[in-house]
From Swiss-Prot:
InterPro entries linked to this entry: DiS_bond_form_DsbB/BdbC, Disulphide_bond_form_DsbB, DsbB, DsbB-like_sf
Membrane-crossing segments per the record: 15-31, 50-65, 72-89, 145-163
Lineage: Bacteria, Pseudomonadati, Pseudomonadota, Gammaproteobacteria, Enterobacterales
Membrane topology qualifier: Multi-pass membrane protein
Main localization, broad class: membrane
Annotated disulfide bonds: C41-C44, C104-C130
Subcellular location: Cell inner membrane
GO molecular function: electron transfer activity; protein-disulfide reductase activity
A GO biological-process term: protein folding
Listed name of the protein: Disulfide bond formation protein B
Amino acid sequence: MMRFLNHCSQGRSAWLLMILTALILESSALYFQHVMKLQPCVMCIYERVALFGVLSAGILGVIAPKTPLRWLAIILWIYSAWGGLQLAWQHTMMQLHPSPFNTCDFFVNFPSWLALNQWLPSVFEATGDCSVRQWQFLTLEMPQWLVGIFAAYLVVAALVLISQFFSRK
């Protein structure tokens, strides 16, 4: 299995699949926001940024999968998936255990050199409350789904990282 993952990581198909999954998830988020009129909260925006990190890792990987750039893509993938998992878990806890002491910020807080909410407010501006449950599918709220999604990204990324130390046949 590890040799297979190593082989896949050195081809473009697996990276394109990762790009496709991230694009579908980002498109779903924009559909929820602009068509279904669900208001994204600060945590939703941060989770969206983590998903863009996974998307960026896929783009890096597809550019040159047989070069050391692949290692940078894998590291970005792990970093983004881990960050997204932490954010989704924290968001889930806010929704499952609401408390006046456990709230999210009123506004997104990006660094001045990366003011995404000012550059593209239709995608990165938060207008909702993190503790409000707006959407449910199969008894799970959106942050709970994201916990599973980011956990899956993280597990696959860790396996791909480990597979890099197995030689290709």
